[in-house]
Curated annotation (Swiss-Prot):
It comes from Mycoplasmopsis synoviae (strain 53). Part of the 30S ribosomal subunit. Forms a tight heterodimer with protein bS6. The gene is rpsR. Residues 98-111 have a biased composition (Basic and acidic residues). This is Small ribosomal subunit protein bS18. Belongs to the bacterial ribosomal protein bS18 family. GO terms for cellular component: cytosolic small ribosomal subunit. GO terms for biological process: translation. Coiled coil: none annotated.
Amino acid sequence: MAYNKRKKGYHNKKRTCHFCDNKLTYVDYKNVEDLKKFVNAVGSIKPKVATGNCAKHQRKVTLAVKRARLMALLPFAVARIRVHRSLVSAPASQNTKKVAEKVEKEKAPAA
């Protein structure tokens, strides 16, 4: 007879809402340090599952982040460093040669 084997004792811990725990009713858009906790590295708002907020406070956080972006307190998108594929795929010796050539070109006019 087929049955499902379940692992006992491995229940996911449910995250509690930060605002409900601290009994905060207002999410301030000017408090950038707290809002950065709800924004990921790219600059997009983290989902409710990741933050643990309840639906009510997640909507308030979303509104506060959008207001902070409009007031230029938070960036819309964070600048990412992009690496050219040709430099990444080339062997290390070629990369060092290219970098050395660039450094020499920069030093030559200054001397």
